């Protein structure tokens, strides 16, 4: 099996370079789901469904109504997914958008 081990973070700020990390967890998906993530099985299942495409995981649900305030939060994923290196970063404009778009992988 190809290794899958990630460090996931949520931070307050508009980029990974400047955001203060508020939470961080580990997630390993092979050979079995493990790590400090509160829902390892669900997060690994969501990653498998997207073929490890993190951009598909941070889509804001259709019909979501959020204010236009700028209070950014940034999520990151670093590590290895099915044998290939991953370095992902996405910034949500505000907490409402983050809640609507982060999915199971960034739910911690």
From Swiss-Prot:
Know the name of this protein?
Protease inhibitor SIL-V5
What is the native source organism of this protein? Answer: Streptomyces luteoverticillatus (Streptoverticillium luteoverticillatus)
- State the GO CC annotations: extracellular region
Where in the cell is the protein located?
A: Secreted
Keywords recorded for this protein, A-Z: Disulfide bond, Protease inhibitor, Secreted, Serine protease inhibitor
Q: Where is the signal peptide?
A: none
Chief place where the protein resides: secreted
Q: List the disulfide bonds.
A: 29-44, 66-96
Supply one GO molecular-function term. Answer: serine-type endopeptidase inhibitor activity
**InterPro entries (UniProt xref):** Prot_inh_I16_SSI, Prot_inh_SSI_I16_CS, Subtilisin_inhibitor, Subtilisin_inhibitor-like_sf
Subunit-structure text: Homodimer.
Q: Where is this site: Reactive bond?
A: 68-69
Q: What family does the database annotate? A: Belongs to the protease inhibitor I16 (SSI) family.
